[in-house]
Amino acid sequence: MKAVVLTLAVLFLTGSQARHFWQQDEPQSPWDRVKDLATVYVDVVKDGGRDYVAQFEASALGKQLNLKLLDNWDSLSSTVAKLREQIGPVTQEFWDNLEKETEVLRQEMNKDLEEVKKKVQPYLDEFQSKWHEEVELYRQKVAPLGAELREGARQKLQELQEKLSPLGEELRDRARTHVDALRAQLAPYSEQLRERLAARLQALKEGGGAALTEYHAKASEHLSALREKAKPALEDLRQGLLPVLENFRDSLLAAVDEATKKLNSQ
């Protein structure tokens, strides 16, 4: 039941921290989110790509060409994994520095979110109570029909469905009414939160124009440092890819040459 209320609440208050705002868990850092998403994406692409390569090599054409793509794929995966290990600490340092520079702004925004949460919580509790009452009322109306079905024969199934249909529609309509009422109650607070966030940014822009410039300058500085520190790792990646590409090129040329000889001999 609480999941329903939490889901509805997120519909009215947006933002990157919304899901953490209504929960007790600490939000992930930006680096953790990026790292998790990148890891999942790379793993899916790597595993899926290896499966396709393995299927191709197992085919008649793959056996005939004998390109040894799977060996090259494993070498490439190993090189990419090494790159991730080398760049990981550098990227972590970048996010740590950026979070440190924006700590004050994030604290002010979290304070606004917490204040709005306290104001809207009574409306969420009221909605949860009403929703529970509606579900309980629906359960009471449906219970006799279930007993009737158990006691009756199969031919009563259609009759039961006809009786359940209006009850389901009634529950849906009543739930929609409560949702609309909740939306109307939360709308002022949602607008208030948006106005506060806009005011924070406007204050930074006007009275704290220097602060925004400083944020931009420090972010650019951190990005430049990230690029410089990542150069050795990227160069290692390039050097690691060269043998793989050369091996693939030689295998492909040999396969084409062999196929040409077979065609000429026929």
UniProtKB/Swiss-Prot annotation:
Keyword Manganese: no
Any one GO cellular component localisation term in the record: extracellular vesicle
Top-level taxonomic group: Eukaryota
Sequence-type repeats, residues: 67-88, 89-110, 111-121, 122-143, 144-165, 166-187, 188-209, 210-231, 232-242, 243-266
Molecular function as annotated in GO: cholesterol transfer activity; phosphatidylcholine-sterol O-acyltransferase activator activity; phospholipid binding; protein homodimerization activity
Tagged with keyword Nucleotide-binding: no
Region (10 X approximate tandem repeats): 67-266
Location within or outside the cell: Secreted
Pfam families for this protein: Apolipoprotein
Keyword terms, alphabetized: Cholesterol metabolism, Glycoprotein, HDL, Lipid metabolism, Lipid transport, Lipoprotein, Oxidation, Palmitate, Phosphoprotein, Repeat, Secreted, Signal, Steroid metabolism, Sterol metabolism, Transport
Residues modified to Methionine sulfoxide: 109
GO biological process, one term: phospholipid efflux
Similarity comment text for this entry: Belongs to the apolipoprotein A1/A4/E family.
PANTHER family: APOLIPOPROTEIN, APOLIPOPROTEIN A-I
Record function comment: Participates in the reverse transport of cholesterol from tissues to the liver for excretion by promoting cholesterol efflux from tissues and by acting as a cofactor for the lecithin cholesterol acyltransferase (LCAT). As part of the SPAP complex, activates spermatozoa motility.
Protein name per Swiss-Prot or TrEMBL: Apolipoprotein A-I
Originating organism: Neomonachus schauinslandi
Originating gene: APOA1
